[in-house]
């Protein structure tokens, strides 16, 4: 298998994950900013790899598999770090909800693909808006430069949590008839 540039970008995103985790734990005043910058860079490759794969017609099965895995692992780890840092229920609850939703919907998509109905649970615009709010909130909550950005990040986290429920409901609703069949 020959790897193309979009797939290399996805692999690079996976490689960046331990670096933003390490930056998160560094005992320096600048560490949160470095952590957030690495996360922003990784999140940008999420958009850019898909854009290039479509533009250059270089979509591959491996890339189609790895891209969502890299995204979900990156976001789940960032949510765990944020929940650990704040150590309060009102951050942990939306973080846990978002992680649970990713597991549920990934399982649902896998099951729907097995029965030949993967398109019923294709990514929706709500999922894309949720991801944007989620990424924005995580950048601010990893960085924490001042109270205003932190507050805006909390708001974005809750917007992402609401969209998490909404999109999960939509996906489950789309698959409900198939889920209830014997």
Swiss-Prot record:
Keywords: Cell inner membrane, Cell membrane, Lipid biosynthesis, Lipid metabolism, Membrane, Phospholipid biosynthesis, Phospholipid metabolism, Transferase, Transmembrane, Transmembrane helix. It holds the Pfam family CDP-OH_P_transf. It is a multi-pass membrane protein. The chain crosses the membrane at residues 13-37, 61-81, 87-107, 146-168. Its main location: membrane. Signal peptide: none annotated. GO terms for cellular component: plasma membrane. It comes from the Bacteria. Pathway: Phospholipid metabolism; phosphatidylglycerol biosynthesis; phosphatidylglycerol from CDP-diacylglycerol: step 1/2. PROSITE patterns: CDP_ALCOHOL_P_TRANSF. Its EC number is 2.7.8.5. GO terms for biological process: phosphatidylglycerol biosynthetic process. Residues 1-12, 82-86, 169-181 are cytoplasmic. Residues 38-60, 108-145 are periplasmic. It is an enzyme of class 2 (transferase). The keyword Cell membrane applies. It catalyses: a CDP-1,2-diacyl-sn-glycerol + sn-glycerol 3-phosphate = a 1,2-diacyl-sn-glycero-3-phospho-(1'-sn-glycero-3'-phosphate) + CMP + H(+). It is found in: Cell inner membrane. Belongs to the CDP-alcohol phosphatidyltransferase class-I family. This is CDP-diacylglycerol--glycerol-3-phosphate 3-phosphatidyltransferase. It comes from Yersinia enterocolitica serotype O:8 / biotype 1B (strain NCTC 13174 / 8081). The lineage of its organism: Bacteria, Pseudomonadati, Pseudomonadota, Gammaproteobacteria, Enterobacterales.
């Amino acid at each position: 298998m020959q790897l193309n540039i979009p797939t290399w970008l996805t692999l690079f995103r996976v490689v960046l994950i331990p670096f933003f985790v390490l930056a998160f734990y560094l005992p320096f005043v600048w560490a949160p900013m470095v952590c957030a910058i690495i996360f922003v860079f990784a999140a940008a490759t999420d958009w850019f790899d898909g854009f290039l794969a479509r533009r250059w017609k270089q979509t591959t099965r491996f890339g189609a598999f790895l891209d969502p895995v890299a995204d979900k692992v990156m976001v789940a780890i960032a949510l765990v770090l944020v929940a650990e840092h704040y150590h309060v229920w009102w951050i942990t609850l939306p973080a846990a909800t978002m992680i649970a939703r990713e597991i549920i919907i990934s399982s649902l998509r896998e099951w729907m693909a097995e029965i030949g109905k993967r398109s019923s649970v294709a990514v929706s615009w709500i999922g894309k808006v949720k991801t944007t709010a989620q990424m924005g909130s995580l950048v601010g909550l990893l960085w924490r430069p001042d109270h205003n950005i932190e507050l805006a990040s909390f708001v974005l986290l809750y917007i992402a949590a609401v969209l998490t429920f909404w999109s999960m409901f939509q996906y489950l609703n789309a698959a409900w008839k198939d889920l209830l069949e014997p």
